[in-house]
């Protein structure tokens, strides 16, 4: 996790993104000066300011979803017709891809590479588009969309995991500042659990478990705590079913320098 910031419902989804990106890119560059950074996001972040910022920085590229419109759909008309024919003959989802240059009427400062996916399903046409700074010589249209952009779904799953398992979507106070503080707490908890996955749960049955599952099996457990002069004793119930896992994870954490 690099950033967690709330925005008002009356603001553009991409409001403040460049401001947040600049210090993140600077920190990454300090640690890995030669590493290439690629920004991947849905169409809510397809804004000229974000794309221009990436284009002005070396080894900083983007692959962003692009909302469809009549001009874009017209550009892939032949591919949509071909996909429809394939669907009618196979009765399966069919898709064709087209690579072209495109510029909006007013909001973009220059032409950019756009990949159109002309997909035809049982319910009808389903055109999709992305815009990118990555050259076609590096990734053709199909691989860029299917292998790279669609992998964004895993990122969305991580966001949902934090929302559902760690209450990142809770905004029940009247103040934006207090709701932002709640999001920070949720984000800190996610980072701690992710660190536990990496250092303590690797190779165990919970290595790929989601936050709520880890919390239920390792955190939300009944125990008796007794404090003496030199020690804190934690006594688990004999019926606790994950005691062996808890002990194994705790032992791993103890082996980390400065750990438990």
Task: Identify the function of each model-found stretch.
Residues 192-260:
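A short, flexible helix-boundary coil/loop motif
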Residues 144-181, 185, 189-196:
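Short amphipathic alpha-helical "interface-anchor" segments enriched in bulky aromatics
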């Amino acid at each position: 996790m690099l950033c967690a910031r709330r925005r008002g419902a009356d603001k553009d989804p991409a409001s403040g993104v460049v401001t947040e990106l600049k210090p993140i890119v600077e920190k990454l560059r300090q640690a890995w000066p030669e590493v290439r950074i690629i920004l991947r996001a849905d169409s809510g972040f397809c804004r000229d300011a974000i794309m221009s910022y990436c284009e002005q920085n070396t080894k900083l590229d983007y692959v962003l979803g692009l909302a469809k419109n009549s001009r874009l759909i017209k550009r892939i008309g032949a591919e949509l017709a071909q996909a429809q024919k394939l669907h009618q003959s196979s009765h399966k989802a069919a898709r064709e891809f087209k690579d072209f240059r495109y510029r909006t009427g007013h909001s973009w400062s220059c032409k950019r590479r756009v990949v159109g996916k002309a997909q035809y399903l049982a319910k009808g046409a389903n055109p999709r588009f992305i815009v990118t700074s990555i050259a076609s010589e590096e990734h053709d249209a199909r691989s860029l969309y299917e292998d790279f952009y669609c992998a964004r779904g895993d990122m969305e799953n991580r966001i949902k995991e934090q929302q559902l398992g760690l209450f990142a979507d809770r905004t029940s106070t009247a103040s934006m500042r207090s709701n932002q503080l709640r999001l920070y707490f949720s984000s800190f908890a996610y980072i701690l659990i992710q660190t536990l996955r990496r250092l303590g749960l690797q190779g165990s049955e919970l290595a790929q478990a989601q936050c709520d599952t880890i919390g239920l099996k390792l955190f939300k457990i009944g125990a008796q705590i007794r404090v003496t002069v030199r020690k804190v004793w934690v006594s688990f119930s004999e019926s606790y079913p994950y005691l062996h896992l808890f002990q194994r994870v705790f032992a791993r954490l103890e082996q980390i320098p400065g750990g438990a």
